[in-house]
Amino acid sequence: MGRTLYDKIFDEHVVHTEEDGTAVLYIDRHLVHEVTSPQAFEGLREAGRKVWRVSSIVATADHNTPTTGWERGYDGIADPISKEQIVTLDKNIQESGAAAFFPFLSKRQGIVHVIGPENGATLPGMTVVCGDSHTSTHGAFGALAHGIGTSEVEHVMATQTLLAKKAKNMLVKVNGKVAPGITAKDIVLAIIGKIGTAGGTGYTIEFAGEAIRDLSMEGRMTVCNMAIEAGARAGLVAVDDKTINYVKGRPLAPTGVEWDQAVAYWKTLHSDADAKFDAVVELNAAEIVPQVTWGTSPEMVLGIDAVVPDPDKEKDPSKRGAIERALTYMGLQPGKPMDDIFVDKVFIGSCTNSRIEDMREAAAVVKKLGQKVAKNIKLAMVVPGSGLVKEQAEREGLDAIFKAAGFEWREPGCSMCLAMNADRLEPGERCASTSNRNFEGRQGAGGRTHLVSPAMAAAAAIHGHFVDIRQFA
């Protein structure tokens, strides 16, 4: 019987299988940042161990790094705990001898899930782990990638392996072509809206169908980034020419004979025609409209042409209660049109949507509208995903477009996605955000988050409220 893409990668990395089915899985790439690594490095020291395979590590500071004040260097990091974590990462990586390190203030520093792919550290067929939930991003390359906990970070550092039980296989097919103006973010939010945040629990999801194949590599990264928000362990897209062309020539990609050998293998990284999936979900791409979340979970999402749901129309008591709680927290009334929701702040960034194509998408809307940020917007900020993205955007003049309209153009980092630095919402503030989670307090205590695409966020900044960007497509 044929094998799925997930089966192929998982099986080829099994070192040993226990009687209960738990596998010892070899890990090819270990992405490291400043928040979940200090305890792991300290654990190695206390046990008298060293990092088993230093060359597998790619490290950067991203969660705590400030997006302003870089001219002051490390003194620009206001929070002492944040500063300590960043300094500690510098020391730990230096001590470990890892060469692929992109520290705070360096040209190639950025969000770990942005700098990994752009440096060629993420390759098809790899197993990739990181002490971060959104490691699933790297599945866009036909790699098996998922987040791990701090104790597992230490385990991988010490042994280059991870204990794992094989997940079930889910195929999500997005059939046909999307309408103009519909983005990867809209596609993945529509998927989550359909299957729910528990729909993928126990599964690894392979994303397929014409709409997925049509996406660029950056679009596929956006989709796989949010596989975890559908409850899945990981998300995958089969390798094709787009994958190979994206990787070619990047600093950490193979070259010469090794490149030829790698490409020959990568071309096998797709599910066989007779592969069996445990679950199949299908969406019609033509039916997907610009998406906006209204509640406190990514599954609480609707099209821009919809209205805020009425809990009284929900028959399930638990679901009705969840809707009521979400509406209370979000300060929304049932029946309110989604395009009549005004926002206070706009955040364009995060590991979901901070790459160069995201910057171009948002800037194109701003340029087309030709107006300033609306008066009710307290802050509209654009945070590139890496130093290289920032440089490229500035070469293209995108920063000038944003700044002329009243946006703040910031330094790279995770920023307002999770409010671990100074970028955050105040209680009651409402934000149009291109990030991946709209949980209570995610962007700051009492903050209200609406997840949207970069184009939708840019349009909301100019109009002051959500609008249907299809009219600008």
From Swiss-Prot:
InterPro entries: 3-IsopropMal_deHydase_lsu, Acnase/IPM_dHydase_lsu_aba_1/3, Acoase/IPM_deHydtase_lsu_aba, Aconitase_4Fe-4S_BS, Aconitase_4Fe-4S_dom, IPM_dehydratase_rel_enz, IPMI_cat. Keywords: 4Fe-4S, Amino-acid biosynthesis, Branched-chain amino acid biosynthesis, Iron, Iron-sulfur, Leucine biosynthesis, Lyase, Metal-binding. The keyword Amino-acid biosynthesis applies. Pfam families: Aconitase (PF00330). Binds 1 [4Fe-4S] cluster per subunit. It is an enzyme of class 4 (lyase). Coiled coil: none annotated. CDD domains: IPMI. One of its GO terms (biological process) is L-leucine biosynthetic process. Pathway: Amino-acid biosynthesis; L-leucine biosynthesis; L-leucine from 3-methyl-2-oxobutanoate: step 2/4. One of its GO terms (molecular function) is metal ion binding. Belongs to the aconitase/IPM isomerase family. LeuC type 1 subfamily. NCBIfam families: leuC, PRK05478.1, PRK12466.1. Heterodimer of LeuC and LeuD. This is 3-isopropylmalate dehydratase large subunit. It comes from Acidovorax sp. (strain JS42).
